[in-house]
Amino acid sequence: MKKVVITGGTRGIGLSMAKEFLKEGCKVTISGRGSRASEELVVELKPYENSYQYVACNVRNISEVEALWEEAAKHWGSIDIWVNNAGQNVPHEFSYNTEASYVDAVIDTNMKGVIYGSQVAAKHMLEQGYGQIWNMEGLGSNDMIQVKTILYGTTKRALTYFTKGLAKELKGTPVMAGLLSPGMVLTDFMTKTPEGETSPVLQNKSFQFIFNNLGDRPETVAAFFIPRILATRKNDAHIVWLTNAKSFLRMMKAPFVKRRLI
């Protein structure tokens, strides 16, 4: 029975992963920025009410990340798996037109939040003698450049570099670091602006075609991730959902197999 912490675990791929871990009998700490778990979250996780806890945490603040570890470890006794999933998107806009507040938010959450989470988890896991740290890739991790998303992509490219470096630093220790590559996932993160409004990118015909053929629902990706996370012992592991081969096959089938997500 593994004990798991997931930052940004209240919705989207984070919540879907939490549910899959719970189905596997794990104990899960879900963190989010709200002071308490939403009613919707409580209802959705009702079948697992004795197997999870919610802890408020702003990953931009390292003292709150440290408190997250302390609370989870106190509640479950130890932590086996730490998933840095919390992320921040930005308006679909050219980088030079993006307000400074959004620049700060995406860097503080996607970069500093992952670094803080990895620092806290690595230190404590080295002390306890075991553990896994997983960081979530995204658009930009593979060097692909898409205009009007380059600020987000920059943070994800940096995250990949950081995680690979962390794995090298942890080489020869009982702690491993790895990457999760979910591909294109249908969540509010993709379909909404930071203010919660419908993203204008959804009206783009080219985006619609690509997403309908290459995108997936979060529960599909989570069901793929969790068994592999639980089975992994290798440092510098890379679990990839949307492989190049899978992408190629889907695009080849596109004229004959209609997939519609948006």
State each model region's role.
Residues 118-119, 164:
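A short, exposed helix-loop element centered on a Lys and neighboring polar residues
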Residues 132-158, 163-164, 168-171, 184:
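Catalytic loop of short-chain dehydrogenase/reductase
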Residues 24-41:
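Conserved glycine-rich Rossmann-like NAD(P)H-binding loop of the short-chain dehydrogenase/reductase
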Residues 179, 198-251:
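C-terminal helical subdomain
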Residues 56-67, 100:
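The beta1-alpha1 cofactor-binding region of Rossmann-like NAD(H)/NADP(H)-dependent oxidoreductases
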